[in-house]
Amino acid sequence: MAGDHAGDQSFYDFLIEEPEMIAPTPPGQFPHQQPISSPNRTSRNTPLRPESTEIETHHHANHPPALPVLGMQLPVPGTVPESSRAQSRASLNLDIDLDLHAPSHPSHLSHGAPHEQEHAHEIQRHRAHSAQSSAGLPPTGFASHLPPASSGPVSLGWNMYHVPPNLHLNANQFNFEVPGHMNVSGHPTHLEHSSTNPNSFHYEHNIVSPSSIHPSTAHFDGEVPSQWDDSLGHGASTPKVRTPSHHVSSNPWAEINEPTGGDNDNLAPVTRPRKPARARRQKKEPRKLSDASQGARSSSTGGTAHSVSDAASPSSTSHQSRASLTSKSASMTSAASTASSRKSKLRSASRTSKNTLDKPNDTAEDRRTRASHNLVEKQYRNRLNAQFESLLHALPEQIRHGDNGGGNGNVDNESEQANDLDRRVSKGEVLEMARRHIEALERERNQLGT
């Protein structure tokens, strides 16, 4: 008997020391419970319960010898022989079978298909007992933290130490409807994905996503291998995913860089129109070289003074860089201007573009687009030049001619007039003249004020 009491004490220590066996209970809900005390070790006449294999959560009046442990009713120690514990102490098998697919049947936990016939009579025998004792259930325990639902028994077959006790939870709080079907077996080393294996992991439920509102769009099916590989390295298989092809194209969580079937058809014609543009670029290279040489000759004969607009005029390098684009972007630039007028004003924007002669192979649509763009650009240049010309004419004569330098005293007026006619004023020079004129006016105002 000493060995039996020692085994019982270790069993109670196991229940108390293991944190997962103790359910957290909110404060203020513990009823008045008796402390756990070991039985009289000298007494050999310990009363035995009618069924020593039951662990009940119901506080019933018919079982006074049971001790309450945090909502669980444990039998009096010494009722389970130690030989059965010693043989099965190394094995703990917990098999759960959740049948949540049928909403009309209550949910239950059992050993699965092989063990349902063993515990069928026990489930029927304790169903009436669970319904009667559910009213007297204390507020503490495992079942007190779950929301109440419809009535029905819930049985849990827990094969511990080869002793088949039945842990009856509150049936009114576990019977709730969940859409879907889930069959969970034990922990085999490898789960075979076949329709003939009863222990296969099978979960089938409708996935709700922004792109898959209909229930027939996608679902998990563990029996049909598809996209995922069993390469996790722990020996257990993972559930497979089977997704229709139309769901992949409309999936909002798909990768952005992944091309779909419709995108592949649209990518091909994007690069095809560039081939004739390259051919035209090769044909235009000798013409650009000739235009560059003509522009160099015209700039050398036009005079020694250069303006900002001459430096900003397109050259052969700008034509070569823009020729890689389409013909529309290349038509935005204009060639070098012809001989400049010998007037003391800004350069006129009435230059004619040579793009109309350089592109004989262009279509009528390209020519119309180029002509309209050139017209808008010419109007912009004309308005801007008109504003600078009005600013230049508003400046006094000494400001406009004072930019030539102070060493012009030995030069007659005729030569100065000739230089003024040949000289072209840039926009930057006009702004500099206006700044100096404003400074002179401010100095005069300060002198008059003092």
UniProtKB/Swiss-Prot annotation:
Gene Ontology MF: a single term: DNA binding
Gene3D superfamilies: Helix-loop-helix DNA-binding domain
Sequence ranges assigned to domain bHLH in this UniProt record: 368-441
Record-linked Pfam families: HLH
Regions of compositional bias (Polar residues) in chain numbering: 31-46, 291-304
Biased composition (Basic residues): 272-286
Biased composition (Low complexity): 101-112, 305-341
Biased composition (Basic and acidic residues): 113-125, 356-377
The entry's keywords: Allergen, DNA-binding
Transmembrane segments: none
Signal peptide: none
Region Disordered, residue ranges: 18-87, 99-148, 185-377, 398-426
Name of protein: Allergen Fus c 3
Source organism of the structure: Fusarium culmorum
Higher taxonomy: Eukaryota, Fungi, Dikarya, Ascomycota, Pezizomycotina
